[in-house]
């Protein structure tokens, strides 16, 4: 029983403005839709159901019925979902605008209540006040919202969400923004609405209001790779594939600094209808490059590492070793389809082997060494503390020599041409015979930064950018990168 969905269905019949604003895919005829994957709340109709991916941001936040309208909370078009979406910092004035919008779209007065009651009583055996028949009148005005952190911004999607106790498999979390407003003013507003209802409905209205306005906010979730769908990718088998984003726009662009003022546009119904008549869609192809995806890929590699290679005498690259049960790696995993990751793995292992061999370690493939447990962490460049600790333990394992208070390790074993070039690039044009700890860190990080320079990466994919940001980046030709040409970050 989705209260918000029911309210939209009944209230859209009131006038022309409501019929335009409150049109939901969940209340229309069902059309073929993508397969659902996660359990959560549809941001468009607020019902708890199975969710599918959004074509605007790749997050799972829309039900299979609402997906037909392709609405995203990051759109520019002021549809109902966009007008309910606020961005930090939310002020009391912003909330006043939201409450005014609610009162405009979902009014409760004596005349309207009688109209709905008479409509219900026209049906056979409906003289009682059963809650399912009057569900649309039982939606209180609250400051309940689902929130998500994207880059440096927190977004709040206000609405009336039932079943808060149910399992949430999405990155959105419930928050109560009542502290940003006056509790007594909100109470008064709802008591006034409630006073027009029959006594039996007043009790249910009050119960719903207090349960949805006095709850404790939950801690914000951290995004993971699995929160984003692969369905927006042009070629799901290509690791450098672009992601196709569709955004709903209007002819009169509004600046992002006025994000929270979008709900004010319905004050003038004629102007709002004119704005919506100018709506159109913009399509963008964006890179999937970001820390979130990179961290996920390196996490997989760290679990596949065969550290025995650093003591081996194989002439081939680490990924090309065959017929050696200690060094041969399973390269059938999808992650190895990315040529950048193959290069990084081969070069990191080649450089570490050169360090180990240069410092008198004459082990072989089957050796069981204490340093092995730290090798996988050297690929976790996004986890700085763990990465630094791994490099430190590797360097100490080399038994460096103290010279004037600084410890040095030898580097006189042959490395491949790619590694040699990177070493020269980062060590003033030459390959040094001795390295200190900082030199070792610089070279190891340079091998990774050559293709994945995480220092300058976004935290989340560009699909989570606002429409204005996408438009600006597109003009600068910064939505895509040159990996398909095998050009690295440095090049």
Curated annotation (Swiss-Prot):
GO biological process per UniProt: symbiont-mediated suppression of host cytoplasmic pattern recognition receptor signaling pathway via inhibition of IRF3 activity; symbiont-mediated suppression of host cytoplasmic pattern recognition receptor signaling pathway via inhibition of IRF7 activity
Record GO cellular component, one term: host cytoskeleton
Keywords on record: Host cytoplasm, Host cytoskeleton, Host-virus interaction, Inhibition of host innate immune response by virus, Inhibition of host IRF3 by virus, Inhibition of host IRF7 by virus, Inhibition of host RLR pathway by virus, Interferon antiviral system evasion, Metal-binding, RNA-binding, Viral immunoevasion
Broad class of the protein's primary localization: host cell
Highest rank taxon of the organism: Viruses
Record's keyword annotation contains Cytoplasm: no
Region entry Important for cytoskeleton localization, spans: 82-176
Signal peptide feature range: none
Region (Zinc-binding domain): 42-79
GO molecular-function term, one example from the UniProt record: metal ion binding
Record flagged with keyword Thylakoid: no
Residue span of motif pLxIS motif: 485-488
Localization (cell): Host cytoplasm, Host cytoskeleton
Ranges where the record places region RNA-binding: 1-81
Purpose of the protein: Plays a role in the inhibition of host innate immunity by inducing the degradation of key host factors required to activate interferon production such as IRF3, IRF5 or IRF7. Associates with components of cullin RING ligases (CRLs) including CUL1 or CUL3, which are essential multisubunit ubiquitination complexes, to modulate their activities.
Swiss-Prot/TrEMBL domain comment: The integrity of the zinc-binding domain in NSP1 is important for degradation of host IRF3. The pLxIS motif targets host IRF3 for degradation; however phosphorylation of NSP1 pLxIS motif is not required for its activity.
The family this protein is said to belong to: Belongs to the rotavirus NSP1 family.
Subunit structure: Interacts (via C-terminus) with host IRF3; this interaction leads to IRF3 degradation. Interacts with host IRF7; this interaction leads to IRF7 degradation. Interacts with host CUL1 and CUL3.
Protein name: Non-structural protein 1
Naturally occurring in which organism (per UniProt): Rotavirus A (isolate RVA/Cow/Thailand/A44/1988/G10P8[11])
Lineage of producing organism: Viruses, Riboviria, Orthornavirae, Duplornaviricota, Resentoviricetes
């Amino acid at each position: 029983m989705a209260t918000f969905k029911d309210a939209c269905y009944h209230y859209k019949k009131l006038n022309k403005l409501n019929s335009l604003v409150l049109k939901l895919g969940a209340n229309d005829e069902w059309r073929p839709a993508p397969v659902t994957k996660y359990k959560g709340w549809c941001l468009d109709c607020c019902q708890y159901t199975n969710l599918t991916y959004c074509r605007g941001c790749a997050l799972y936040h829309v039900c299979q019925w609402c997906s037909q309208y392709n609405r995203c909370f990051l759109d520019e078009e002021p549809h109902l979902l966009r007008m309910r979406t606020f961005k930090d910092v939310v002020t009391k004035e912003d909330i006043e605008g939201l409450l005014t919008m609610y009162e405009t779209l979902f009014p409760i007065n004596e005349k309207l209540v009688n109209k709905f009651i008479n409509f219900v009583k026209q049906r056979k055996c409906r003289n009682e006040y059963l809650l399912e028949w009057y569900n649309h009148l039982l939606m209180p005005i609250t400051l309940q919202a689902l929130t998500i952190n994207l880059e440096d911004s927190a977004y709040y999607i206000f609405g009336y969400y039932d079943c808060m106790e149910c399992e949430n498999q999405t990155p959105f979390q419930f928050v109560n923004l009542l502290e940003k407003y006056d509790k007594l003013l909100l109470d008064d507003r709802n008591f006034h609405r409630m006073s027009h209802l029959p006594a039996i409905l007043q009790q249910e209205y009050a119960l719903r209001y207090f349960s949805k306005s006095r709850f404790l906010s939950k801690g914000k979730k951290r995004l993971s790779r699995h929160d984003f769908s692969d369905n927006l990718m042009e070629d799901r088998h290509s690791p450098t594939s672009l992601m196709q984003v569709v955004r709903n726009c209007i002819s009169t662009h509004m600046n992002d600094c006025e994000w929270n003022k979008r709900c004010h546009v319905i004050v003038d119904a004629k102007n709002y209808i004119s704005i919506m008549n100018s709506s159109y869609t913009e399509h963008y192809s964006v890179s999937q490059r970001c820390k979130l995806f990179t961290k996920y890929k390196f996490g997989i590699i760290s679990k596949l590492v065969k550290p025995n290679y650093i003591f081996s005498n194989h002439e081939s690259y680490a990924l090309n070793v065959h017929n050696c049960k200690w060094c041969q790696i399973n390269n059938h995993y999808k992650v190895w389809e990315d040529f950048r990751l193959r290069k990084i793995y081969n070069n990191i292992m080649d450089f570490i082997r050169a360090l180990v061999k240069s410092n008198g370690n004459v082990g072989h493939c089957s050796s069981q060494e204490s340093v092995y447990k730290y090798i996988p962490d050297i690929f976790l460049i996004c986890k700085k503390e763990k990465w630094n600790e791994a490099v430190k333990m590797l360097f100490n394992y080399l038994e460096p020599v103290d010279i004037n208070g600084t410890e040095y390790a030898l580097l006189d074993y042959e490395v491949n041409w790619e590694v040699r070039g990177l070493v020269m690039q980062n060590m003033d044009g030459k390959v040094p015979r001795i390295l200190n700890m900082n030199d070792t860190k610089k070279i190891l990080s340079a091998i990774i930064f050559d293709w994945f320079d995480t220092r300058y990466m976004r935290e989340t994919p560009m699909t989570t950018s606002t429409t204005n940001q996408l438009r600006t980046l597109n003009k600068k030709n910064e939505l895509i990168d040159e990996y398909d040409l095998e050009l690295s970050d440095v090049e």
